[in-house]
C-alpha cells in the first residue's frame, strides 16, 4: 500500500479496476472484514448536481466497527467528531484509487491517550486490509 509522499496521513492504493468495479469491491470487502457500511456519498454526482464542474469520480464510504467506535468514545467522547471512518474510491488523471486518512495519524493529532493509539492501530490494520482486498481485481471479499 503506497502513500503518495511517504509522509502524508493519506493511505492511497491504485487499482487496475474501473471506478464502478472498485466501488463494488469495496462495498463487498467492508462486511467481509467485520465493519458495517453506514452510507455512501457520491461526491462527484453531488457537485455536478449543484452546478460545479467536476470531471472525476469520487464516492465516500462511511464505515464503522461498533466495538472499536465504543472504545474511542469511552476514552474521549469528543472524538465522536472523528467518526465514522471514511474510505474513498476516486479517479484521478485516468487512474482509479482507493484511500483513507490514516486512523493512527488522525487520532494521534487529536489525542495522546495510549488506549486511542491502540484502537487506531487495530482499526487501521483492518481498514488497510479492506482497501487491499478491494483493490485486488477478482479478489473475493
Feature roles, as predicted:
Residues 2-33, 132, 140-141:
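Terminal, regulation- and interaction-focused segments at domain boundaries
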Residues 7-9, 57, 83, 94:
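A generic structural signal for well-ordered coil/turn residues at beta-strand boundaries
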Residues 86-113:
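Beta-strand/loop substructures that line and gate deep hydrophobic ligand-binding cavities in soluble
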Residues 109-141:
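Well-ordered alpha/beta subsegment
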Residues 38-88:
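Compact, glycine-rich, soluble single-domain proteins
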Residues 80-93, 131-140:
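Short secondary-structure transition/capping segments
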Residues 27, 44, 128:
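Short glycine-/small-residue-rich flexible loop motifs, especially phosphate/cofactor-binding loops
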